[in-house]
Amino acid sequence: DVPKSDQFVGLM
């Protein structure tokens, strides 16, 4: 599972 913050950076 990935943290929400890391997930947001991944789609940027």
From Swiss-Prot:
Expression tissues: Expressed by the skin glands.
Family: Belongs to the tachykinin family.
Modified residues annotated as Methionine amide in this record: 12
GO cellular component: extracellular region
GO BP terms in the entry: defense response; neuropeptide signaling pathway
Compartment annotation: Secreted
Keywords: Amidation, Amphibian defense peptide, Neuropeptide, Secreted
Keyword Acyltransferase: no
Top-level taxonomic group: Eukaryota
Keyword Metal-binding (UniProt): no
Principal place of residence: secreted
Annotated InterPro entries: Tachy_Neuro_lke_CS
Function, in words: Tachykinins are active peptides which excite neurons, evoke behavioral responses, are potent vasodilators and secretagogues, and contract (directly or indirectly) many smooth muscles.
Protein name, UniProt field: Kassinin
